[in-house]
Amino acid sequence: SQSAQAGGTMGWRAPELLQGFSLHADDGKERLTRAVDIFSLGCVAFYMLTRGGHPFGELYEREIRILQNQVDTSALSASGDDTVEAEALIKQMIAPIPSDRPSASDVARHPFFWNAAKRVAFLQDVSDRFETLERAPPSFALELLEQSAESIVGPDWRRRFDKNFLEDLGKFLS
């Protein structure tokens, strides 16, 4: 009898690979999906953006940390601009539950990959949407935005955007 075991490089494998999920649906085990590739891609993206880092730590501790979902993405903030979108995307990609990970097409459409024009257009659309909401009495969405504003963007909204984006924003609004 031949058994099929999933491969992969130590420290870069999804938790379901480490837990022994199956390549085949007929052996009674949970089946592996393409989400294993998304997990690995998330780790590789982190590696590239941090110039050698890994979201689950050093080589010999990675697989235990992957199984325990002990993620540390703090190295991204030190790697430069565009880290908010990158961190959000990578966290989705390395989610411990396969069904919580985005598909490849969802990854490709993520705001991390948007150019400045698309980002500004999105913000304008959102802003325009809130401009049309009832102010007296305020709509539920507007109340929710006002209540949560500081926890979402902090005391200075400009700090939530990278320098290049803010420069482009100034060009679009001029």
Residue ranges and their predicted role:
Residues 119-174:
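Regulatory extensions appended to serine/threonine kinase catalytic cores
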Residues 2-24:
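Conserved activation segment of eukaryotic-like protein kinases, specifically the C-terminal portion
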Residues 7, 32-35, 80-83:
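Short, solvent-exposed loop/helix junctions and linker helices
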Residues 19-75:
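Conserved C-lobe activation region of Hanks-type protein kinase-like domains
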Residues 80-94:
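Conserved C-terminal C-lobe helix
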